[in-house]
């Protein structure tokens, strides 16, 4: 990519770079995850308020290498006001994308799922789990681990309600346990496939499944946002 026109984007993370610049990690509509240098302004001023997470932007990136230049940016005035547990859930989603997406590989479905997740999280009384799971499953699909949860991966047999199955990144849905596999009941797999979170226990089962898969892909790298969420929940519960 040499230079593209304005495209929708969200800030995932920013960090100081050299004496008076910042590197801003973005999830963009056209180019996927991109890192760009924001020049000038000085450390004392920090990153401009419009370049904060959970604010929809239009950005123009330039440069030939993997590290781009942030040539132009403007807000669309769409902001997702996350607070409390929803804020830490949003930081978790941002950290996942920073650590697992490859740079400059278009991933429109992940971008759309991210927007949808922010909508879930910004509701007045948000149900965090559906919003989190939506982005996690889109990310797994993007990374090449999308699975039809309604069929056994090796045999093609239809998943049955009353049978316990094993799921792993390498083997998908199976009746045979594998290293790092997680046990999921058949009716929960069917609910997960249809994103039918009204089925009791389906969200909990989906969380166990995505947690195991994402931890394996992270390869032992910690997620700081998880620790922040634990600390917050511990504090609020007294």
Swiss-Prot record:
Belongs to the RecO family. One of its GO terms (cellular component) is bacterial nucleoid. This is DNA repair protein RecO. InterPro entries: DNA_rep/recomb_RecO_N, NA-bd_OB-fold, RecO, RecO_C. It comes from the Bacteria. It comes from Hahella chejuensis (strain KCTC 2396). Disulfide bonds: none annotated. Keywords: DNA damage, DNA recombination, DNA repair. Involved in DNA repair and RecF pathway recombination. Pfam families: RecO_C, RecO_N. One of its GO terms (biological process) is double-strand break repair. The keyword Iron does not apply.
């Amino acid at each position: 990519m040499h230079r593209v026109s304005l495209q929708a984007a969200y800030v995932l993370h920013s960090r100081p770079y050299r004496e008076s610049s910042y590197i801003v990690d973005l999830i963009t509509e056209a180019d996927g995850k991109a890192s760009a240098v924001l020049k000038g302004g000085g450390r004392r001023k920090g990153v401009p308020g419009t370049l904060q997470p959970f604010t929809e932007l239009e950005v123009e990136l330039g440069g030939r290498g993997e590290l781009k230049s942030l040539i132009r940016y403007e807000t669309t005035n769409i902001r997702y006001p996350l607070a409390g547990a929803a804020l830490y859930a949003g930081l978790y989603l941002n950290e996942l994308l920073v650590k697992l997406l490859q740079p400059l590989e278009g991933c429109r479905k992940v971008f759309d799922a991210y927007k949808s997740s922010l909508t879930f999280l910004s509701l007045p009384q948000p149900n965090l789990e559906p919003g989190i799971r939506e982005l996690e499953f889109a990310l797994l699909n993007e990374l090449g681990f999308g699975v039809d949860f309604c069929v056994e991966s090796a045999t093609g047999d239809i998943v049955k309600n009353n049978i316990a199955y094993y799921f792993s990144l390498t083997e998908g849905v199976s009746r045979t346990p594998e290293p790092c596999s997680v046990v999921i009941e058949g009716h929960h797999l069917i609910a997960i496939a249809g994103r039918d979170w009204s089925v009791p226990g389906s969200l909990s089962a989906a969380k166990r499944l995505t947690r195991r898969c994402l931890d394996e892909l992270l390869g032992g790298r910690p997620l700081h946002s998880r620790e922040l969420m634990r600390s917050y929940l511990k504090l609020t519960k007294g």
